[in-house]
Amino acid sequence: MKNPITKFAAAAVIITAITLGLFEFIDTGSQSGVVWAEVAQNVEASQGVIWRLRETGSRDPNDDWPNSYMITWRSPAITRTDRYRGGQIWRTIYYNLDTKTVIGVLHDVQRYHKEAMSDERVQSVRADKDRWTTSQSLINHLLARKHHSLDQKMIDGVLCEGIETTDASGLPVKSFTARGWVSVETGYPVLGEIEIIDDGGIRHTTTLDQFQWNVDLSASDVEPEIPTDYEPL
């Protein structure tokens, strides 16, 4: 059975993939102020990004929506995800592909785990990230889905334009809706929304916001500090 760190790490990789992938829609026929091809280029070129993710519909009875959320820092070599519950940090997972290191911290039980990553694991993590952040492969995937433009609207004081798909073909769900909202001024994503009804009829929602793009993320700033009273897992 996977330990809590391994399960959280796997979930964090999937969420990271979905997060950046959502915004690489392209609407080549759009007449709006946003050039979606440039949005995809902006996302791919950003050397560092930070965002918040909130979810509903989890089957985990310990989740405490709306007080549960995740903050992720990501650069080409580094990914860190902090999960919060009840306003307190609960779990941290950190990957450094340059040093081939993974660190997991279980703040709720004051335990941690640190290990070296094999070359195979580094390649696996990098492949999971590249599958969604390389514009060519992801764009080809998303262009296969029907999508349409949304009217402009203000989001947190920022004028945004959006795009939406409800094409659930090939997905193991009853229904699927994904929306990406981009700043008209900067061409960077501001908000992402995903709504799914699974085969069991349970509605799941994911909200991605509080984006910071082109952030200089160094390992010294992002690597989690392990309190001295935490014990090895």
What do the PLM-derived regions correspond to, one by one?
Residues T101-S175:
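Non-cytosolic head/periplasmic domains of membrane-anchored proteins
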Residues P66-W132, E195-T207:
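An acidic-aromatic
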Residues K7-L22, H141-E161, S169-A178, V184-L233:
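Non-transmembrane domains of secretory- and envelope-associated proteins
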Residues V43-G48, R74, D98, D156-V158, ...:
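Edge/loop elements at the starts and ends of beta-strands within beta-rich repeat scaffolds
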Residues I93, G180-W181:
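A residue-level detector for well-ordered beta-strand positions
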Residues V43-N62, I78-T81:
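A short, Trp-centered hydrophobic/proline-enriched beta-strand micro-motif
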